[in-house]
């Protein structure tokens, strides 16, 4: 039995506006497995939200095939389920949004209850479930509060409880932390991770922030102009991006872009000696354990001056990055660069000293 819960094959989504054809999604194929926290990242207009509307059964693709769980939902531009089956399938997918979409005149309790209005549960069972969900998102004491009495993070917790009311297998987060401050964002991401573990929930994160992908996801797809640029494990994508846009996202998340701007403004780098190189090193896994700069000084007499360093854990794997000035005899520096690459460290020369 397949572990794939969302299977998109060659999805096209086309719109016609004022006699103009717009292809919002172009030949996208993605497989998401049960229990994944899967990120779909891209800038505005990349096609992320349009693709999600097809996943949550609100948008019929122009072409391609979508399978949710064991059921083919759309194929070749046609709905493959009856109206009743489609409605039942939608209940297996929960959704949270950037602006919460809570009803202002209803309490937190009533907002969650609204999702159960068609449930066959008794009133007593509904009450137990609603209070259990509010406790699950750490809002048991806020049941009678209205949205205006809640913080942004608390509103999103109510929205999450509401999205879980019908016991979905999949939870889609469409920019759900974009309106939150950094501290609250981390709290919501932590909650989603907990729900993923406790409930076996498959989470799909739609975002334009690679930091969110890095913090919570195990796999990621990068989209641009409706197309899938690259897809893979977060570790693989972060340690070895294949596309310029992906590299741009990663540099933004790591803060390396700002760091490089400051490094390049330093007198040492502005006036880099002829014998020196400014290099960027990327370490993955066990290669982070080696004292490489100590080794190349010992073996080649090449000094390493660290200007920037960062180590993070992606999954269970450490990923490190250094920006260093290597200085020494030219033939020794070349030998040191080869030794670094042979150690499994990715290397990029950022600047050569003035000759």
UniProtKB/Swiss-Prot annotation:
One of its GO terms (molecular function) is ATP binding. Pfam families: ABC_tran (PF00005), NIL (PF09383). Its EC number is 7.4.2.11. It is found in: Cell membrane. Residues 8-250 form the ABC transporter domain. This is Methionine import ATP-binding protein MetN. SUPFAM superfamilies: ACT-like, P-loop containing nucleoside triphosphate hydrolases. Part of the ABC transporter complex MetNIQ involved in methionine import. Responsible for energy coupling to the transport system. It is an enzyme of class 7 (translocase). The complex is composed of two ATP-binding proteins (MetN), two transmembrane proteins (MetI) and a solute-binding protein (MetQ). The gene is metN. It is a peripheral membrane protein. PANTHER family: AMINO ACID IMPORT ATP-BINDING PROTEIN (PTHR43166), METHIONINE IMPORT ATP-BINDING PROTEIN METN (PTHR43166:SF30). It catalyses: L-methionine(out) + ATP + H2O = L-methionine(in) + ADP + phosphate + H(+); D-methionine(out) + ATP + H2O = D-methionine(in) + ADP + phosphate + H(+). Keywords: Amino-acid transport, ATP-binding, Cell membrane, Membrane, Nucleotide-binding, Translocase, Transport. CDD domains: ABC_MetN_methionine_transporter. GO terms for cellular component: plasma membrane. ATP binds at residues 42-49.
């Amino acid at each position: 039995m397949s572990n794939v819960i969302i299977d998109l094959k060659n999805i096209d989504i086309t719109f016609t506006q004022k006699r103009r054809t717009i292809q919002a999604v172009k030949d996208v194929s993605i497989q998401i497995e049960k229990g994944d926290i899967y990120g779909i990242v891209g800038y505005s207009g990349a096609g992320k939200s349009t693709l999600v509307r097809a996943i949550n059964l609100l948008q019929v693709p122009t072409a391609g095939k979508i399978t949710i769980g064991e059921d083919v939902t759309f194929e070749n531009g046609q709905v493959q389920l009856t109206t009743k089956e489609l409605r039942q399938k939608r209940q297996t997918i929960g959704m949270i949004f950037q602006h919460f979409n809570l009803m202002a005149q209803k309490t937190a309790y009533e907002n969650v209850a609204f999702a159960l209005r068609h449930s066959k549960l008794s009133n007593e069972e509904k009450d137990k479930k609603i209070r259990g969900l509010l406790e699950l998102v750490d809002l048991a004491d806020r049941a009678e509060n209205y949205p205006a009495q809640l913080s942004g993070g608390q509103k999103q917790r109510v929205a999450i409880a509401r999205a879980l009311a019908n016991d979905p297998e999949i939870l889609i987060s469409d920019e759900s932390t974009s309106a939150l401050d950094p501290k609250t964002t981390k709290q919501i991401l932590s909650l989603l991770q907990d729900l993923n573990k406790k409930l076996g929930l498959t989470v799909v994160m739609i975002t334009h922030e690679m930091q969110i992908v890095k913090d919570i996801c195990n796999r990621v797809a990068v989209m641009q102009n409706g197309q899938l640029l690259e897809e893979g494990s977060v570790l693989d994508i972060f340690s070895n991006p294949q596309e310029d846009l992906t590299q741009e996202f990663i540099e933004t998340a790591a803060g390396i872009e700002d760091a490089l701007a400051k490094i390049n403004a330093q007198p040492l780098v502005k006036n880099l000696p002829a014998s020196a190189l400014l290099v960027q090193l990327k370490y993955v896994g066990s290669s982070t354990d080696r004292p490489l700069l100590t080794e190349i000084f010992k073996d080649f007499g090449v000094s390493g001056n660290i200007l920037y360093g960062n180590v993070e854990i992606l999954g269970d794997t450490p990923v490190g990055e250094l920006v260093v000035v290597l200085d020494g005899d030219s033939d020794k520096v070349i030998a040191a660069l080869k030794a670094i690459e042979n150690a499994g460290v990715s290397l990029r020369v950022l600047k050569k000293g003035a000759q």
